From Swiss-Prot:
Keywords of the record: Signal
Signal peptide: 1-30
Keyword Cell cycle included in the entry's annotation: no
CDD domains on file: TatD_DNAse
Record protein name field: Uncharacterized protein MJ1383
Any one GO molecular-function label of the UniProt entry: hydrolase activity, acting on ester bonds
Domain of life, source organism: Archaea
InterPro entries (alphabetical): Metal_Hydrolase (IPR032466), TatD-like (IPR001130), UCP005295 (IPR012022)
Pfam families referenced in this protein's UniProt entry, alphabetically: TatD_DNase
Family: Belongs to the metallo-dependent hydrolases superfamily.
Length: 256
């Protein structure tokens, strides 16, 4: 099992150890731990993931991978400089497997510009992109995200639209992108995720599971708990294997 979206820098070692006991791997992503008043603050955050978090994960035996990028709530003023740094971070460490967490929060002009630049960078580098959708106005902003992507005519379709609900799942699958199901208080319950997987099991190749484990209320066992619920509810083994493991390995090229 792989948890495809966490923020390990917000959790204690005991949580990382618990994940290591249950999961084959996790992906931690850049996010918005504080206001990015300048490029140095953003660099410090990303470099903490690349150095400190890998060291912490190693201590407890957690197989940790990383995505780097500018979260829509954490955009530094020096956008182009940050894009260059993302390139260097990807070259710096093979544990960097994607660009994220990017996306839109309020769909402002600046957010859209930064989002598009990062999608184009993912295209240039042939890397997966992990796209945030907000809790508020999720449907409206998800439509904007899909519209923005459609204008770019990207060859790279390795894009995960995160925190999908039942309605947005259909839209994302219609566009042939990956659906990220987040099992977290305020997003999906394990049973709600099970119902989505059950309804769209014919598209199981395009579904991923995650906990979005962060400083918000979270369940570090969200993925194994959801896998258990899928087994109890009679979802086929091959479907479970795809959404809980295989798709993540294939999409991000994980060495697991």
């Amino acid at each position: 099992m792989i948890d495809t979206h966490i923020h390990s820098d917000t959790r204690g070692l005991e949580d990382l150890e618990l994940m290591a006991m249950c999961l084959d791997g996790v992906i931690t992503l850049a996010h918005d731990p504080f206001e990015m008043k300048n490029i140095k603050v953003w660099e410090a955050h990303v470099e903490k993931l690349l150095i400190n978090e890998l060291e912490r994960a190693k201590k407890v035996g957690l197989n940790l991978f990383i995505c780097v990028g500018m979260h829509p709530r954490a955009i530094p003023p020096e956008i182009d400089e940050a894009l260059d740094k993302i390139k260097s971070y990807i070259n710096y460490n093979s544990r960097v497997v994607g660009i994220g967490e990017i996306g839109l929060e309020k769909a402002t002009k600046e957010e859209k510009e930064v989002f598009i630049k990062q999608l184009l960078l993912a295209e240039e580098l042939n890397m997966p992109a992990v796209v945030h959708t907000p809790r508020r106005n999720k449907e409206e902003v998800t439509k904007i995200i899909l519209d923005e992507i459609s204008t770019l005519n990207l060859k790279n379709r390795d894009i995960v639209i995160e925190h999908c609900n039942k309605e947005t799942t259909k839209w994302v699958l219609d566009e042939e992108f990956y659906v990220g199901l987040t099992i977290q208080p305020g997003k999906l319950t394990p049973l709600e995720a099970v119902e989505i997987v059950k309804e769209y099991k014919d598209f199981a190749d395009k579904i991923l599971l995650n906990s979005d484990c962060s400083s918000n209320a979270s369940d570090v066992l969200a993925v194994p708990r959801t896998v258990l619920k899928m087994k109890i509810n009679g979802i086929e083994k091959d479907v479970i294997y795809k959404v809980a493991h295989k798709n993540a390995v294939n999409l991000f090229g994980l060495d697991i």
